[in-house]
């Protein structure tokens, strides 16, 4: 893995760990570090160019994803995430060995974007796992993302109810990803998240309507109403994944 990381370093500057199929729920966890960004329209192109040049190596032990925020209750315009099933890959990115390159990358990033927040977590469950892994995301796809607060003692009950929903709604998903994960640091009251992929904006709107017609959803919401508190939601569109 060290040789792979050294190869990436030589491209421009070293990549930073920023801040970091079946129709049944599967455990193929991966770790991720994320930045919420505010990028002016004139800097979107240069940001893409920076990421293209930095993360061009094809055999990285991690993925880097840039997304555009479509709907949210804040002024974040883009999201940047580094993810890997191998936590050591992300750890290596953050090590002193690559300190100089990491700081140079950050300096370049700060010239193009305002960093609104940094946080880290782990995806614990994913359905319809893509061929390239649980963290693979297709350019142009939309994702609905819901943040919730759950007390640790109530998490098993929530997860069990979530699994029931997945089983009861599998007919609504063909190539769609439905996942659940945990925030570990940097997200305030939010402890868990649910996300769902959609092929287009129309697919998103029609998909949400289809879910609302399922009895399993009503049962789920009744089950979790005393143990899960909604914190926020957003829709984002994948620009590119390296």
Model-derived regions: residue spans:
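Bacterial N-terminal signal peptides that target proteins for export
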Residues: 2-13
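Short S/T/G/P-rich N-terminal loop/turn motif that feeds into the first structured element of a domain
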Residues: 26-218, 223-242
């Amino acid at each position: 893995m060290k040789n792979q990381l050294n190869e990436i370093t030589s491209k421009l500057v070293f990549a930073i760990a920023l801040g970091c199929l079946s129709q049944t729920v599967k455990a193929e966890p991966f770790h991720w570090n994320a930045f919420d960004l505010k990028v002016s329209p004139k800097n979107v192109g240069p940001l893409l160019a920076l990421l293209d040049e930095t993360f061009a190596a094809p055999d990285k032990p991690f993925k880097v994803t840039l997304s555009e925020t479509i709907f949210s209750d804040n002024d974040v315009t883009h999201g940047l995430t580094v993810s890997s099933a191998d936590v050591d890959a992300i750890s290596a990115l953050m090590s002193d060995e690559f300190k100089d390159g990491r700081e140079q990358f950050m300096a370049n990033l700060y010239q193009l974007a305002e960093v609104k927040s940094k946080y880290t977590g782990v995806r614990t469950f994913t359905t319809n796992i893509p061929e390239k892994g649980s963290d693979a995301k297709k350019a142009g796809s939309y994702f609905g993302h819901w943040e919730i607060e759950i007390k640790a003692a109530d998490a098993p009950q929530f997860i069990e109810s979530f699994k029931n929903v997945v089983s009861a709604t599998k007919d609504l998903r063909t190539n769609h990803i439905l996942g659940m994960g945990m925030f570990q640091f940097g997200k305030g009251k939010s402890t868990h998240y649910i996300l769902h992929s959609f092929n287009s904006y129309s697919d998103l709107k029609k998909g949400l309507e289809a879910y609302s017609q399922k009895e399993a959803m009503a049962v789920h919401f009744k089950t979790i109403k005393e143990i899960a508190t909604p914190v926020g939601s957003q829709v984002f569109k994948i620009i590119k994944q390296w």
